[in-house]
UniProtKB/Swiss-Prot annotation:
One of its GO terms (biological process) is peptidoglycan biosynthetic process. This is UDP-N-acetylmuramoyl-L-alanyl-D-glutamate--2,6-diaminopimelate ligase. ATP binds at G116, T117, N118, G119, K120, T121, T122. Gene3D superfamilies: Mur ligase, C-terminal domain (3.90.190.20), Mur-like, catalytic domain (3.40.1190.10), MurE/MurF, N-terminal domain (3.40.1390.10). UDP-N-acetyl-alpha-D-muramoyl-L-alanyl-D-glutamate binds at L27, S29, H44, Q45, A46, N157, T158, T159, S185, Q191, R193. PANTHER family: MUR LIGASE FAMILY MEMBER, UDP-N-ACETYLMURAMOYL-L-ALANYL-D-GLUTAMATE--2,6-DIAMINOPIMELATE LIGASE MURE HOMOLOG, CHLOROPLASTIC. Its main location: cytoplasm. Catalyzes the addition of meso-diaminopimelic acid to the nucleotide precursor UDP-N-acetylmuramoyl-L-alanyl-D-glutamate (UMAG) in the biosynthesis of bacterial cell-wall peptidoglycan. Carboxylation is probably crucial for Mg(2+) binding and, consequently, for the gamma-phosphate positioning of ATP. One of its GO terms (cellular component) is cytoplasm. InterPro entries: Mur-like_cat_sf (IPR036565), Mur_ligase_C (IPR004101), Mur_ligase_C_dom_sf (IPR036615), Mur_ligase_cen (IPR013221), Mur_ligase_N (IPR000713), MurE/MurF_N (IPR035911), UDP-N-AcMur-Glu-dNH2Pim_ligase (IPR005761). Pathway: Cell wall biogenesis; peptidoglycan biosynthesis. It is found in: Cytoplasm.
Amino acid sequence: MADRNLRDLLAPWVAGLPARELREMTLDSRVAAAGDLFVAVVGHQADGRRYIPQAIAQGVAAIIAEAKDEASDGEIREMHGVPVVYLSQLNERLSALAGRFYHEPSENMRLVAVTGTNGKTTTTQLLAQWSQLLGETSAVMGTVGNGLLGKVIPTENTTGSAVDVQHVLASLVAQGATFGAMEVSSHGLVQHRVAALKFAASVFTNLSRDHLDYHGDMAHYEAAKWMLYSTHHHGQAIVNADDEVGRRWLASLPDAVAVSMEGHINPNCHGRWLKAEAVEYHDRGVTIRFASSWGEGEIESCLMGAFNVSNLLLALATLLALGYPLTDLLKTAARLQPVCGRMEVFTAPGKPTVVVDYAHTPDALEKALQAARLHCAGKLWCVFGCGGDRDKGKRPLMGAIAEEFADIVVVTDDNPRTEEPRAIINDILAGMLDAGQVRVMEGRAEAVTNAIMQAKDNDVVLIAGKGHEDYQIVGTQRLDYSDRVTAARLLGVIA
């Protein structure tokens, strides 16, 4: 499509439409403007067809709406001079429609998908950083935000709507992006938000308990993640062989690259592979010696913890699979930086080491504590809470993990939303063997301050749950608050 017009946009699905020019594409009738294409989908919370009159009143050029049944697919009506085209299974087609509207941006860059419960953000950031060090103009899309490296704009969801995703990709291409690393959530896969993207590679990090409030059980959660490889254009497949689900998937993906830091690879069983041979943790970070089907080498990194070794190896394997030379990757590896709010370290002379991490699942909290322990000479503190109006089943599990892996536990608030903060804390304490030893302090700023002020200079204080977030949701209010800023101020790193 040289320009955006209704006839060409819908040519694969509907004939006989006028060549009406279209300015922008939107799912939100409130922002629909003159010349726009309004798409009325039936969502989980609202039926967009109810807002067709509002969109027409605002001057839209055309409307695509969910058909009431298969028989109505392709039906064309006119309302007040505005063509309304009805398509069945519109949500499933939306990614392809938006892709055509925005001139297939995923085909105009090297786009890598990263899915899994934990490690998505760090792996995407490492991919973007590393590829940029090798000459690409790189961008990221995900939890922290969307944009070119260094120009990331914060977002609400890990994976935006199908229209948002294509729109953002088109914007990144227009800004000169040649490489993109994108977090792909299970919600995004189930809701077809990335269905029409052409991924150059797709990475699986791991699978552990999360989002069961949405998926119901682990089997459905795994099935949602598997969709990336079973129903999407996934390109090169890079899979973590240290994860039980990953090992199962590798049996169904004969061309995949198997990656391991724990030795779960038999090179004779995998055509392409990469595994750690030796890993040394120290106060400056980690030294990794590895072997692979591309050759061997050694990497020095300032990243903390075993799971970041896994993330780094997954990023390395992905770039090798995409054809980047091993020698160039080794030369640039030491310049990779930790991600904002992901095992991010704050230090000052005579003060405890403070680590801020986004860990908000049982598995992530365990991994964060194990990572911090590797670098801890004194006591290991853990300050954390659990989100309100979310999966209650993980609360006692996280309480048990904090008690087992930390020396001193401080339980506090983390986005209580509309739940009673003390009720959330009680759910966490229920998982502990000796809740009487736990320090409870509802106000998060006070809890973080108290822990850092009481910790000794050889202690490590892990503040888990919020990471990069700069807000606390109490009731329906979004209040300014940042673990990172609080820690930096207390250590005197910033005023």
